Amino acid sequence: MELDDILDAGRGDRLFLLGNEAAVRAAIESGVGVASTYPGTPSSEIGNVLSKIAKRAGIYFEFSINEKVALEVAAAAAASGVRSFTFMKHVGLNVASDSFMSVAYTGVRAGMVVLSADDPSMFSSQNEQDNRHYARLAWVPLLEPSNPQEILEYMNHAFELSEEYRIPVLLRTTTRVSHMRGVVEAGERRAEPVKGFFRKNPEQFVPVPATARVMRRELVEKMKKLKRVADTSELNRVLNEDSESDLGIIASGGAFNYVYDALQTLGLDVPVLKLGFTYPFPAGLVAEFLSGLEGVLVVEEVDSVMEKEVLAVATSEGLDVGVHGKLDGTLPEIYEYSEDIVRRAISGLTGIKSHEKGIEAPELPERPPALCPGCPHRAMYYSVRRAASELGIEGEDLIFPTDIGCYTLGIEPPYSAADYLLSMGSSVGTACGFSAATSQRIVSFIGDSTFFHAGIPPLINAVHNRQRFVLVILDNRTTAMTGGQPHPGLPVDGMGEEAPAISIEDITRACGVEFVETVNPMNIRRSSETIRRALQHESVAVVISRYPCMLSEGAVRGRPVRVDEEKCDLCLECLNELACPAIVEEDGRVFIDPLYCRGCTICLQICPAGAIKPEGKR
């Protein structure tokens, strides 16, 4: 499907969309004037699509420097009377949470929707946090769609809700909902202003203690009203309500899809309460659903959020109903669910056995993720190891704090260059801690986009507190891991327009770093020599490793190389030190697959026997 179809579709047109693409269509239909994000899987496709069509749609869109800024951009737009949409992966809401908590107090003048894409089973994340807790923490309404059509409908509804109650609305998706495809029926596009006007009202928008106390009281009153709305919301509905089964099921979000499929497989007619408006929790509706049931299965991903609410409702209403789910072991406490998992839980409660077998897949050899052929990070890892070894710094004497990005794959051998990781930017902050607490040497790795996102404040901290470590900024000219989005270091913005590029060299020097050098990582000799001097520097040293990602438009592809079998003595240094997917050992010989080789020449530079040569040379 062409991306323009998402923009140009008329009312009633049917589109086959990813969940994330449906979110873009919803933004267009709802009249969003400002959209913002920092890219992060599983939400990345929303920004990727918006960046291509926002200009035509009349939407201002930006890839912000981080999620906190993205949320603040959206909040200011909503305060100015312009509908806004900000979206991020689940851990991104941690970064934005300071301002997120406050915008719940100040409220909005136009609709504001915050989409959190959670990642059950941590397919591309460092934790499995359940961001439904944020709705409760911030006191904002929470909607949970189950498929692309619902993403469209729920987002449209969320903007109406946001404006009626002057409050931001949190929309929670999960990896499967974000990345599933489905037929979406387009609706009307709403005309909304793309330029607003901010009318000053410090009593509403400046939460100093005196005004914040008033805002807090108003927020409590809003939530009381929203609780009544949740109880009667059309987003909450009962399926199979005429069923005579004494077991019921309550489900939300992507978990509902597993329930639906499992019941189809089992051929069971069981009442199901599908919750789409899940906070404030619709306690009245749930109490009504529970009455007359002997047991209820609560199916949700990730934490037992609804299950605890259901238990509270059953207790407060004096209902003698068994509540099953994560807490009693009927369902797993962690990771994403599947139809098999939910079907087994239902079978266990009903005694009805399924004759369906789970999908039987052949056992495959493990294939850990790897850096791409020609990746400049591989070259820099080699140079760092080599330089440290030449100075006698090895093993436990050398700590490698790392960060979020492709280079996290440095954890894999032979690089083994990832010893500590917490979050975006933590490579720099934790280097400060290791420098203060140990006498070990430290080399931290951070990417270019991550440096802009969260690496600058801890670098200032390091200089001010006289810490000593080497910071390697891996500048591959893109936000690579999430799909190649731009960042402030590039001369282009989120809508493809020319923009000022911010120099990493200038920033690091402005932070007070005296040792700042830029290298081409594909030059092993020069890179190793620079790292060697950086390790000998008595304070913070920054080495910027600059070379374009091999998957980017600016990728450099050289002439493929080959192994001269007459010279190769099978020392296997190329294999053991680089782990490049293009280098293969087979039948007692080493060869380089020309389909994979990008001509980076790193293997050529490190071969002790000089047995690797460019194609065509003898």
Swiss-Prot record:
4Fe-4S ferredoxin-type domain segment(s): 559-590, 588-617
Enzyme class at the top of the EC tree: oxidoreductase
Keyword hit for 4Fe-4S: yes
Source taxon at top rank: Archaea
InterPro entries linked: 4Fe4S_Fe-S-bd (IPR017896), 4Fe4S_Fe_S_CS (IPR017900), HACL1-like (IPR045025), IorA (IPR017721), Pyrv_Fd/Flavodoxin_OxRdtase_N (IPR002880), THDP-binding (IPR029061), TPP_enzyme_TPP-bd (IPR011766), Transketo_C/PFOR_II (IPR009014)
Temperature dependence per UniProt: Optimum temperature is 80 degrees Celsius.
pH-activity relationship: Optimum pH is 10.0.
Catalytic activity, as annotated: indole-3-pyruvate + 2 oxidized [2Fe-2S]-[ferredoxin] + CoA = (indol-3-yl)acetyl-CoA + 2 reduced [2Fe-2S]-[ferredoxin] + CO2 + H(+)
A GO BP entry: sulfur compound biosynthetic process
Keywords, ordered alphabetically: 4Fe-4S, Electron transport, Iron, Iron-sulfur, Metal-binding, Oxidoreductase, Repeat, Transport
A GO molecular function held by the record: thiamine pyrophosphate binding
EC number(s) reported in the record: 1.2.7.8
Entry binding sites for [4Fe-4S] cluster 2: C580, C597, C600, C603
Cofactor(s) recorded in Swiss-Prot or TrEMBL: [4Fe-4S] cluster
Binding annotation for [4Fe-4S] cluster 1: C568, C571, C574, C607
Subunit organization: Heterodimer of the IorA and IorB subunits.
Function recorded in the entry: Catalyzes the ferredoxin-dependent oxidative decarboxylation of arylpyruvates.
Name used for this protein in its record: Indolepyruvate oxidoreductase subunit IorA
Organism (species): Methanothermobacter marburgensis (strain ATCC BAA-927 / DSM 2133 / JCM 14651 / NBRC 100331 / OCM 82 / Marburg) (Methanobacterium thermoautotrophicum)
